[in-house]
Protein backbone atom coordinates (compact mmCIF):
# COMPACT_ATOMS: atom_id res chain seq x y z
CA UNK A 1 0.00 0.00 0.00
CA UNK A 2 1.22 3.54 -0.64
CA UNK A 3 2.96 5.79 1.85
CA UNK A 4 1.75 9.26 2.79
CA UNK A 5 3.93 12.25 3.63
CA UNK A 6 2.40 14.47 6.32
CA UNK A 7 3.85 17.97 6.77
CA UNK A 8 2.75 20.23 9.64
CA UNK A 9 4.24 22.81 11.98
CA UNK A 10 7.65 22.58 10.32
CA UNK A 11 7.82 18.79 10.77
CA UNK A 12 7.63 15.99 8.22
CA UNK A 13 6.25 12.53 8.90
CA UNK A 14 5.99 9.41 6.77
CA UNK A 15 2.92 7.25 7.29
CA UNK A 16 2.02 3.82 5.95
CA UNK A 17 -1.53 3.10 4.93
CA UNK A 18 -3.23 0.40 6.97
CA UNK A 19 -4.27 -2.78 5.13
CA UNK A 20 -7.19 -3.33 7.52
CA UNK A 21 -8.85 -0.06 6.43
CA UNK A 22 -8.93 -0.49 2.63
CA UNK A 23 -12.11 1.53 1.99
CA UNK A 24 -10.93 4.49 4.06
CA UNK A 25 -7.47 4.40 2.47
CA UNK A 26 -8.85 4.13 -1.08
CA UNK A 27 -11.21 7.08 -0.60
CA UNK A 28 -8.62 9.24 1.21
CA UNK A 29 -5.98 8.68 -1.48
CA UNK A 30 -8.34 10.26 -4.02
CA UNK A 31 -8.25 13.51 -2.03
CA UNK A 32 -4.46 13.85 -2.16
CA UNK A 33 -2.79 16.24 -2.01
CA UNK A 34 -5.02 17.34 0.88
CA UNK A 35 -4.36 20.61 2.70
CA UNK A 36 -6.19 21.66 5.86
CA UNK A 37 -5.66 23.11 9.36
CA UNK A 38 -4.89 20.94 12.37
CA UNK A 39 -5.79 21.99 15.93
CA UNK A 40 -5.38 20.48 19.38
CA UNK A 41 -8.14 18.17 20.64
CA UNK A 42 -10.50 19.23 23.41
CA UNK A 43 -11.73 15.90 24.76
CA UNK A 44 -9.32 13.17 23.68
CA UNK A 45 -6.05 13.83 25.53
CA UNK A 46 -2.76 14.09 23.65
CA UNK A 47 -3.79 14.39 20.02
CA UNK A 48 -4.42 16.89 17.26
CA UNK A 49 -7.35 16.86 14.90
CA UNK A 50 -8.60 18.17 11.60
CA UNK A 51 -12.27 19.15 12.02
CA UNK A 52 -14.20 18.42 8.82
CA UNK A 53 -17.77 19.30 9.81
CA UNK A 54 -20.37 17.60 7.61
CA UNK A 55 -17.79 16.34 5.05
CA UNK A 56 -18.33 12.75 3.96
CA UNK A 57 -15.47 10.58 2.74
CA UNK A 58 -17.00 8.74 -0.20
CA UNK A 59 -16.11 5.46 -1.84
CA UNK A 60 -18.04 5.66 -5.08
CA UNK A 61 -21.40 7.14 -4.14
CA UNK A 62 -21.50 5.67 -0.64
CA UNK A 63 -19.96 7.13 2.51
CA UNK A 64 -17.12 5.14 4.05
CA UNK A 65 -18.31 3.41 7.22
CA UNK A 66 -16.44 1.98 10.18
CA UNK A 67 -13.51 -0.39 9.61
CA UNK A 68 -10.48 -1.14 11.77
CA UNK A 69 -11.90 1.37 14.25
CA UNK A 70 -10.53 2.11 17.70
CA UNK A 71 -11.02 4.54 20.57
CA UNK A 72 -7.48 4.11 21.89
CA UNK A 73 -4.94 5.01 19.20
CA UNK A 74 -1.23 4.56 19.88
CA UNK A 75 1.33 7.29 19.32
CA UNK A 76 1.57 7.85 15.57
CA UNK A 77 -1.81 6.36 14.70
CA UNK A 78 -3.99 8.46 12.41
CA UNK A 79 -7.74 7.89 12.63
CA UNK A 80 -10.45 8.99 10.23
CA UNK A 81 -13.81 9.40 11.95
CA UNK A 82 -16.64 9.19 9.38
CA UNK A 83 -19.42 10.43 11.69
CA UNK A 84 -22.36 10.45 12.31
CA UNK A 85 -22.40 10.90 16.11
CA UNK A 86 -20.00 13.84 16.00
CA UNK A 87 -18.49 15.82 13.17
CA UNK A 88 -16.23 14.12 10.64
CA UNK A 89 -12.55 14.44 11.54
CA UNK A 90 -9.00 13.19 11.23
CA UNK A 91 -7.21 12.51 14.54
CA UNK A 92 -3.43 12.21 14.99
CA UNK A 93 -2.33 10.79 18.37
CA UNK A 94 0.96 12.06 19.83
CA UNK A 95 0.57 10.65 23.35
CA UNK A 96 -2.04 9.11 25.65
CA UNK A 97 -5.37 9.34 23.91
CA UNK A 98 -8.95 8.16 24.35
CA UNK A 99 -10.86 9.38 21.29
CA UNK A 100 -13.96 11.30 22.37
CA UNK A 101 -16.21 14.28 21.73
CA UNK A 102 -18.51 16.26 24.00
CA UNK A 103 -21.14 13.52 23.53
CA UNK A 104 -18.74 10.80 24.74
CA UNK A 105 -16.32 8.17 23.49
CA UNK A 106 -15.92 7.69 19.73
CA UNK A 107 -14.10 5.19 17.50
CA UNK A 108 -12.26 6.18 14.33
CA UNK A 109 -10.87 4.17 11.44
CA UNK A 110 -7.17 3.48 12.00
CA UNK A 111 -6.07 4.11 8.42
CA UNK A 112 -2.51 5.48 8.69
CA UNK A 113 0.45 4.78 10.98
CA UNK A 114 3.40 7.17 11.19
CA UNK A 115 6.62 5.21 10.72
CA UNK A 116 9.17 8.03 10.30
CA UNK A 117 9.38 11.27 12.25
CA UNK A 118 7.44 9.84 15.19
CA UNK A 119 9.99 11.42 17.55
CA UNK A 120 8.63 14.86 16.50
CA UNK A 121 4.96 14.15 17.15
CA UNK A 122 5.02 15.46 20.72
CA UNK A 123 6.72 18.67 19.55
CA UNK A 124 3.97 19.16 16.95
CA UNK A 125 1.30 18.50 19.57
CA UNK A 126 2.80 20.99 22.05
CA UNK A 127 3.27 23.59 19.29
CA UNK A 128 -0.36 23.18 18.23
CA UNK A 129 -1.55 23.42 21.84
CA UNK A 130 0.37 26.62 22.64
CA UNK A 131 0.61 28.34 19.25
CA UNK A 132 -2.73 27.34 17.75
CA UNK A 133 -3.82 25.93 14.41
CA UNK A 134 -1.12 24.68 12.05
CA UNK A 135 -1.24 24.01 8.32
CA UNK A 136 -1.21 20.29 7.52
CA UNK A 137 -0.56 18.69 4.16
CA UNK A 138 -1.17 15.04 3.30
CA UNK A 139 0.43 13.91 0.01
CA UNK A 140 1.77 10.78 -1.63
CA UNK A 141 5.34 10.09 -0.56
List each language-model region with its residue ranges.
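N-terminal intrinsically disordered, low-complexity, charge/repeat-rich segments that act as generic
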Residues: 1-20
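Glycine-rich active-site loops that engage anionic ligands at enzyme catalytic sites
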Residues: 16-141
Amino acid sequence: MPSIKITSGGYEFLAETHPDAPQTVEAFLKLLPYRQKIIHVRWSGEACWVPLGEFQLLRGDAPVGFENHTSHPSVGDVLFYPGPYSETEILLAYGSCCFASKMGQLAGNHSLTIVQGKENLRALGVKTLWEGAQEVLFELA
